[in-house]
Design a protein with these regions (language model features):
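Extracellular and secretory-pathway beta-repeat/beta-biased strand scaffolds
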Residues: 2-380
């Protein structure tokens, strides 16, 4: 087992970017957390540790619905959802037309419950943003969520909502969607869970999305349509235009590291990372993707078979400044495969797309479909 070569490869990736860049995002004052009164009592909640019990919303079967006028959490603050153990999904919308600024902790005390947070006006996560949720987390700027059995949870026109016991089946967009930005934050879900960002343009700047042995979904769209998370796909339907994904990593900013135990110990994480026992899946959909120095890892540890990375970009993709995508394997299982489609794919300045084995397991396949492909890995 060549553990040293695996960890050296990850650390080599960290140091490969040679060109620094800077980005400044203002984090303005905000209105805190208010309920809009459409599902329960309306009014401002007391901070800085906002408590959101079930009776402020409406429970239908395993779905607990909440409706907020504003939802922003400042540095050092928290918002804690609570309710009975019968809740499977906490589904919150923001209707007031203001961007949600999250620089504190979003928490749930309901065991295993998934969290949906919907704000059509936009979402910005700061460098202190964290998640403390035992289920999956889905963040979106969609106008509505389509539920099974004819249900609908509408943030654009709340009166159109039809609340049902059925799970969420689609994220629906009516207007050109607002962006989602993660500026320096570390957003993590527990092992085997899903972390989704589904909205307009998506920007990750020195940020880390981590779903160990789980799944990450990113869909960036630019018009009306629906995004459907399926078991083995992330379908985008009815869109005239798709949006832009930007991943930027300043090489002077230290990466988040995690201790995954022996034999690997402490390893640095990618900007998108589902690595773990058996690996995890990553689905990316959009109109274009610029990756400057970012890492996308779905590496497999142990004896279980890995899962795949599936990227479908309608337009141009540019990997630059040491950007990297891998489904490497350290163990006896089979590594995940990479399926990557784009109109134009440019891999530049030390960047790469790889699947490699560092142990007895077999590496997965890499399939690239592009009308134009340029590979120039010489560092500039």
């Amino acid at each position: 087992m060549n553990t040293s070569r695996f960890t050296d490869t990850r650390r080599w990736f960290i140091g490969i970017a040679a060109t620094a860049f800077t980005m400044t995002l203002a984090f303005p004052a905000h209105a805190g957390v208010t309920t809009d009164g459409t599902l329960g009592q309306g009014g401002a909640l007391a901070g800085p540790n906002y408590r959101i019990p079930a009776d402020l919303g409406q429970q239908v079967g395993g779905n607990l619905f909440h409706s907020f006028g504003q939802f922003s959490i400042d540095t050092g603050e928290s918002a804690t959802f609570s309710g009975p153990n019968s809740v499977n999904n906490i589904i919150g919308r923001v209707t007031g037309g203001e961007v949600s600024f999250i620089d504190g902790t979003i928490r749930s005390t309901i065991p295993g419950a998934n969290l949906y947070l919907l704000n059509p006006a936009g979402l910005l996560f700061g460098e202190n943003a964290t998640l403390d949720v035992s289920g999956s987390v889905h963040v979106s700027t969609a106008d509505y969520l389509r539920l099974g059995d004819g249900g609908r949870f509408d943030a654009h026109t709340p009166g159109n909502s039809v609340l049902t016991v059925a799970p969420v089946v689609a994220f629906g967009f009516l207007d050109p969607p607002a962006p989602i930005t993660v500026n320096g934050g570390f957003l993590r879900v527990p092992d085997g869970q899903t972390l989704s960002l589904i909205g307009g343009d998506i920007t990750l700047h020195n940020a880390t999305l981590y779903a160990p042995a789980g799944r990450i979904d990113l869909a960036t769209v630019g018009s009306a349509g629906e995004v459907l998370p399926l078991d083995h796909d992330l379908a985008v339907q009815g869109f005239d235009t798709l949006g832009a994904l930007t991943i930027e990593r300043d090489p002077v900013v230290a990466r988040v590291t995690v201790d995954i135990g022996e034999p690997l110990g402490e390893i640095p994480l990618g900007d998108l990372d589902t690595s773990g026992e058996g690996g995890g899946a990553i689905f990316i959909r959009g109109g274009q993707w610029v990756n400057r120095g970012g890492g996308v890892f779905a590496d497999t540890h142990g004896a279980r078979a890995g899962r795949d990375v599936d990227v479908a970009i309608a337009g141009n993709v540019r990997f630059d400044q040491g950007a990297w995508l891998s489904t490497d394997i350290l163990g006896s299982g089979t590594g995940g495969s990479i399926s990557f489609s784009a109109h134009d794919l440019n891999i530049l300045n030390g960047s790469g797309i790889t699947t490699e084995t560092f142990d007895s397991g077999n590496a997965g396949d890499v399939t690239i479909t592009a009308r134009n492909l340029l590979v120039d890995r010489q560092d500039s």
